[in-house]
Amino acid sequence: MPLLLTGKKFHNDLNKNKCLAMFAPLEGGYETRLLRRMRAKGFKTYITSARGLGDPEVFLLKLHGIRPPHLGHQSIGRNGALGEVQQVIPQASELFNENDKDKLLWLLEGQVLSQSELESLIKICTSDNKLKIVVEMGGSRKLEWKSLNDYILNEF
């Protein structure tokens, strides 16, 4: 029985566009098959949710601070009015440990991202030649994808 999803067309489109908007059936399974195919082709992959991403460039690539949740009355003499800021390493830092491999960042629940956040993801792809990004933008009856640029032009 032949493979129904070899990943060749997906791989070619990903290399050509660098940033793809993906629409997959809601029952799932397609993203893991494609991730497995991309790993076999030499990509280092990282999958995460787009919820709570904030500024994508800072959150994914740079050292940034976060504030812990407010847990009731605390003294402000020690930390000031805004509270303590903890430094956090970039979420996708493990992708950038190896410079020789192509990198694939897969974002789930991408429909919550605004137009400016999607444009920021495209800028990240153009600045780093080895980085490719796939953003799942919602469900569909069949697996389909298009360039993130085309998606932004048509949807917003």
Curated annotation (Swiss-Prot):
Gene Ontology terms, MF aspect: oxidoreductase activity, acting on NAD(P)H, quinone or similar compound as acceptor; quinone binding
This protein's name: NAD(P)H-quinone oxidoreductase subunit N
Source superkingdom: Bacteria
Chief location of this protein within or outside the cell: membrane
Alphabetical list of Pfam families matching this protein: NdhN (PF11909)
Subunit field text: NDH-1 can be composed of about 15 different subunits; different subcomplexes with different compositions have been identified which probably have different functions.
PANTHER family from the UniProt entry: NAD(P)H-QUINONE OXIDOREDUCTASE SUBUNIT N, CHLOROPLASTIC
GO terms for cellular component: plasma membrane-derived thylakoid membrane
Compartments, as annotated in UniProt: Cellular thylakoid membrane
Job description of the protein: NDH-1 shuttles electrons from an unknown electron donor, via FMN and iron-sulfur (Fe-S) centers, to quinones in the respiratory and/or the photosynthetic chain. The immediate electron acceptor for the enzyme in this species is believed to be plastoquinone. Couples the redox reaction to proton translocation, and thus conserves the redox energy in a proton gradient. Cyanobacterial NDH-1 also plays a role in inorganic carbon-concentration.
Membrane-spanning parts: none
Catalyses which reaction(s): a plastoquinone + NADH + (n+1) H(+)(in) = a plastoquinol + NAD(+) + n H(+)(out); a plastoquinone + NADPH + (n+1) H(+)(in) = a plastoquinol + NADP(+) + n H(+)(out)
EC assignment: 7.1.1.-
Membrane topology: Peripheral membrane protein
Keywords of this entry: Membrane, NAD, NADP, Plastoquinone, Quinone, Thylakoid, Translocase, Transport
Similarity comment: family membership: Belongs to the complex I NdhN subunit family.
Enzymatic class: translocase
